[in-house]
Regions:
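Pre-NBD coupling/linker segments of ABC/ABC-like ATPases
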Residues: 2-13
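Conserved beta-strand-loop-alpha-helix hinge in the C-terminal portion
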Residues: 230-248
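ABC family nucleotide-binding domain
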Residues: 17-220, 225-226
Length: 248
């Protein structure tokens, strides 16, 4: 498994696509009740690219994210992250790879109520052989002054910052976010999106954000749209994407 992770790190330093999804298919149910949720999705993202995946409820966005993150299996297709074809990994290696190399941020924070902000993040720090320095991370997330507080003592936005810190502390190459601002009011949502942009600048991880909110697309290098399980748009945001990355 260590050699697998080493290959992922080496691949991340090249100019190839960091995340490559080919022919991804997923359905639920059987026979007449069978529903195709993803229909042959092809996506390639560069290292450090921010991708916003848009689409109405039921379009397959969360299923796509779950499969890319190894939380669900695909019916067909392959997923390569940092040079590692994770769809080929046996279950035990996939679990270890996911813990070490992927970060997840969800709409609901799922913080441990009896742990402080620092302790909630430290829980995930030990899963990585190369974690980020805790003090630096807390400061960059604006949580330093709240580090000894418990979840019930901080706001929803601060709780989401803590959840982001929990995902980042492992120093992942790929950060997967499912409606990260869905439970927040407008002003706090704006702050969290600005934080995600800062995270991308500071740590260079590839970020995929799933949302139904078109307003989020301004922060993306790439904008994907799903409709009824099909990829109907794959657009580059040339206003913020460096020219050297306009090749994907």
């Amino acid at each position: 498994m260590r050699s697998t992770i080493k290959r992922a790190i080496m691949a991340a330093e090249t100019n190839r696509a960091f995340l490559e999804v080919r022919g991804l298919c997923k359905s639920y149910g059987q026979d007449e009740a069978r529903v195709e949720v993803l229909k042959g999705i092809d996506v390639a993202l560069g290292k450090g690219e921010v991708c916003v995946l848009l689409g109405p409820s039921g379009s397959g966005k969360s299923t796509f994210l779950n499969i890319v993150g190894g939380l669900e299996s695909a019916d067909a297709g392959s997923i390569e992250v940092g040079g590692v074809t994770i769809t080929d990994l046996p279950p035990s290696d996939l679990v270890e790879y996911r813990r070490r190399e992927l970060g997840f941020v969800f709409q609901f924070y799922n913080l441990v109520p009896d742990l402080t902000v620092t302790e909630n993040i430290e829980v995930c720090q030990y899963l990585s052989p190369n974690p980020l320095p805790m003090d630096d991370l807390l400061k960059s997330l604006g949580l330093w002054e709240h580090r000894r507080k418990f979840p019930h003592e901080i706001s929803g936005g601060q709780q989401q910052r803590c959840a982001i810190g929990r995902a980042l502390v492992r120093n992942p190459g790929l950060l997967l976010c499912d409606e990260p601002t869905g439970a927040l009011e407008y002003h706090t949502s704006k702050e969290i999106l600005e934080l995600m942009e800062q995270v991308n600048r500071d740590y260079g991880c590839t970020i995929v954000i799933v949302t139904h909110n078109d307003a989020i697309k301004h922060m993306a290098h790439r904008i994907l749209r799903l409709r009824d399980g099909e990829l109907v748009a794959n657009e580059l945001n040339e206003h913020i994407l460096p020219a050297r990355e306009l090749t994907w």
